[in-house]
Structure formats: C-alpha cells, structure tokens
Amino acid sequence: MSTLRDNWRVIFLVAAILLSTFALFSPTMGNQSPIGEDDSATNLQFGLQLDGGTRIRAPLVGVTAEDVEFEGDSERVVERQVAAQIAGADAADIIVRTGAESSTVEATIENVTADDLSAALDAAGYAHGEVRDGVTGTTRAETVRVLQSKINEAGLSGGTVQQVTTATGEHFILVEVPNRDQSDVVDLVGERGTVQIDIYYPTGTDNGSRTYETREAVLTQADFTSIGTAQESQTGSGAFVPVSVRDDPAAEFQTAIQDTGLAQPGGTRCTYMEDGGRNTTEGCLLLVVNGEVVNAFGMSGGLADTMRAGEWAGAPSFQLQTRNTSEAQEIAINLRAGALPARLDLSGEDSGTSSYISPSQGESFKFDSLITGIVAVLAVAGVVFIRYGKPQVALPMIVTGLSEVYILLGFAAAIGYPLDLSVIAGFIAVIGTGVDDLIIIADEVMGEGSVKSRKVFQSRFRRAFWVIGAAAATTIIAMSPLAVLSLGDLQGFAIFTILGVIVGVLVTRPAYGDILRLLLTEDR
C-alpha cells in the first residue's frame, strides 16, 4: 500500500493514458459515419486541412437600426409594419429585438440598404437612431447555432461553425466541413431553410374560370413538435416526413382547413404541380421551402373526416409529402435545425468566399504532419541523449513527453475536436515545451551531484517545479487571448498548447519526478 501511495502520480499518468486509449479506440466513443464512408481506425476527427473539404467565410446579409422606439407596439406588429414598407420583404425578413438599454430592428432581405430600412421605419412611424450595415451579435450567435445544427443533422462529421472577427472589426461566419464537396455545403448552408405550409383553395368562379386564394404560413417551423426521419412512400413514388404539431397551432390549422373547404367528404385531389393544374385543382396544401413551392398535395378521406369532426387537433400528426427522398431529407433537416435568421452573403462582394481542398491534398498534409512530428520527436530524443547519456534519465523523459501528446489526442477524440494543421503545430509546441520542462527537472535534480537520498531529491524537485509552474502560468496567460478570441486557426493552436501545459503540470511532470526518484535514489 505504501508503494501505491508513494507513486500515485505515476498511477495517475497510467490512468490518463488508459482513458485516452479508450477515447481513441472504443467504438462507443466514435461518431456514426455517414453511409459510404470508410471507418477510421481511431475516433479522431480531422479538419478540412487534413481530410479535404469545404471552407466558407462570409458575412450575414442585413442592416440594423439602433435605438428604435416601438410606441407600445408588439414585436410581431413592428415586423409586419416595417416589412410592408420594404419591397419584396415579409415579416420573416424583419427581426425585432427589445432590450433594457436599446431596441433594434434588423432587415435581412437581400439587397436592402441602410437607407431602405431608415425610410421604412420613418414610413411606419418608428423613431430610430443610427442605421448601419450588418446584423446584431445575437443574430450572429443564433446563425452559428442553426448552421451547426444543420451540419449535425446532415451527418457531416467534423463540421464546425464559428464567428470570426477581423482586426478592422468586421464579422464573418466561418463554416468548415471536412470531406465534402463545395456545392453540397453551399446548398446546405446557403439558404435560410424556411419551411411552411400554405393552403391553396378555390373561392368561386369568374367568367367561367375558378378563382383561387392562398392562405400563407398556416403552419411554420416553430409549430412542429416532433419531426420524424425521411421515408420512402410504400404506396407509390415520392417520400414523406412524418410530423406532429403543437396543440395551439394544431387547433388553428384545423380551423383553417375547415374554413377553406379543404376537408371535403372523400378528401381532395390536388393537381397544382401539373401543367395548367393551378387553375383547375381542388384545394391543396402547399409545402413551401425557402419561398418556393416544392410540392402540393391534397387530403385523404380519412384525414378530411377527422378535420371536419374537429378530432384531428386531439392527436395532431400527418405526413409532409415530397417528390423524392432528397427533398424529404432536406425538409427534415430544416425543420429540426430551424430557419436561419439571416442568410450568408456568398456573392463575394463583401469578402464572402468559399474554397475547397481535395481529399488527396488533405492526405498529403496528414503525411507531412506525421513526418514533421516524427522529426520533432527524434530531434528531441537526440538532444536528450547527448545531454545526459544516461538511459534511466533520457528514456523516461521521452516516454513521458510523448504520453502528453497521446493524452491530448485522447482528449480531442473524446470531445470530437477536428484536428487541423494549427492543432498539429500545437502538439509539436507541447513536445518542445514539455521536454524543456523535463530537462529543467533533470538538471535541477542532478546538477549538484548524485542524489541518493529521497529527502534531497524531493527538495531539488520542488525547486524545479516552482520554475516549471511559473513558466506554465506565463504560457497560459500569453495564449489565453488567442484561445478566447475568434481568430480562426490560431484558436486551435492556442487551445491545445494551453491544454498541453495544464496536462504537463498536473500529470506528466509530477509522474516524471516519481520515475526519476525510483531510478536515482536508494531509499525509495
């Protein structure tokens, strides 16, 4: 028991290595790979620099008015009033935010200018302060959340979304998706992802022709409480997404179906999508995605009966019909992730860019990174052996230093952090600073002659550890701004350099001290 108590730091190091091994290789820790992708031998995820993929860096479309006075109107009323004054806008393109200190109105429709929003607010009767290009920080944060959710729902392993800020104060959204074509990623994140249900119904005749009206947004994304997975239809072509509706909107939807006459005995047959069908069809439910009708469908007799009887709202569920499985999958993703509050400006006019790294180039970067790491380890090993010439000092130093990197790899696998070139640079920095600290320990312990007594060893080790602790604190303080600020690749470098320093001070340096004590002292 005394041996275990005296060497608990070494045991702690071994436990950390075992946990890292579990995180790296356990099937229970790995993310589900999309169908058709090869499974990796480890649970490590790689960024697009090492796996190939697409990077998108773009600002958000929109302008913002500060210090708006709403004159007691609700947010919904303000959105409708302002949207009515901007050509081509609807309430979904206007974001109203109220705060204790300031209230803002954002217009996120394309090609809108600060002058357009200012004129719209004036016409609607709302006093306001400065009107500027760009959106609020809250909108940027919500956009990051929705985009990350979209990427996760689409099964794009290793995809990341973050805000980045330039030195001049410009704000961008940075999207990185490894191992995916540029067109696929742009299609996923380029649209706002709005999904709504409209009712298209006949209202009478005019000169022998039917007349129609559209009741828009009878159901929107916020009205759905459960979204199933996209499924192929068993009765014919097409696909569908099973959904459930919240109680309050379900009652309103049922009333709208009754009022528009869509719930006919025996159901309705919709020919909206056929040539000339818009002028002859019976009532239809329109599935509208990003402002475009992607499908139209009638109502089955059974569903129509429950609507007419007022029973459907008690168990409000139905199927969103689509023409194919890919449409159904897109709709399911948009419903789960939510709509983007503002679109990414991918036009390139405001520095919006997208780039693609081929998988073969990513594999080349992986190989080069591996070679660089091996060269760094061999260089450190050579210097250590030349300096000491004692295997009992040098070998534990190298093994302990490498275990630090292994623990960091396990941590990256556990949290699913995608490795890129900046993180690899952080690992190499950890090897250098880690072995440097171990050399300080060895020099302090052995610099005043041989050490046989455990008491003398502990005294010298404590002096060395104070130096190491001060150096670690300095590194953490220096790197913290890079880790906190959204500075792209520098953030990954800083995070793993700081983690390496922390692991070194808490785990590997104390363990190396215990190993040296066991090998050098006689009263162990």
Curated annotation (Swiss-Prot):
Null allele phenotype = A double secD and secF deletion grows very poorly on solid medium at 45 degrees Celsius, confers a severe cold-sensitive growth phenotype (30 degrees Celsius), as well as having defects in Sec-dependent protein translocation. Has no effects on Sec-independent Tat substrate protein export.
- Source species, domain of life: Archaea
Topology relative to the membrane, per the entry? Multi-pass membrane protein
Q: Which GO terms describe its cellular component?
A: plasma membrane
Query: Would you kindly state one Gene Ontology biological process term found in this protein's UniProt entry?
Result: intracellular protein transmembrane transport
Say if the entry is tagged with keyword Nucleotide-binding.
no
Membrane-spanning ranges? 10-30, 366-386, 389-409, 420-442, 465-485, 487-507
Could you list this entry's UniProt keywords, alphabetically sorted: Cell membrane, Membrane, Protein transport, Translocation, Transmembrane, Transmembrane helix, Transport
Report the main location listed first in the record. membrane
The free-text function statement in the UniProt record for this protein reads: Involved in protein export.
**What subunit structure does UniProt give?**
Part of the protein translocation apparatus. Forms a homodimer and complexes with SecF.
Per its UniProt record, what PANTHER family does this chain match? PROTEIN TRANSLOCASE SUBUNIT SECD, PROTEIN-EXPORT MEMBRANE PROTEIN SEC
Instruction: Check the record and name the HAMAP family matching this protein.
Output: SecD_A
This one is known as: Protein-export membrane protein SecD
Name its species: Haloferax volcanii (strain ATCC 29605 / DSM 3757 / JCM 8879 / NBRC 14742 / NCIMB 2012 / VKM B-1768 / DS2)
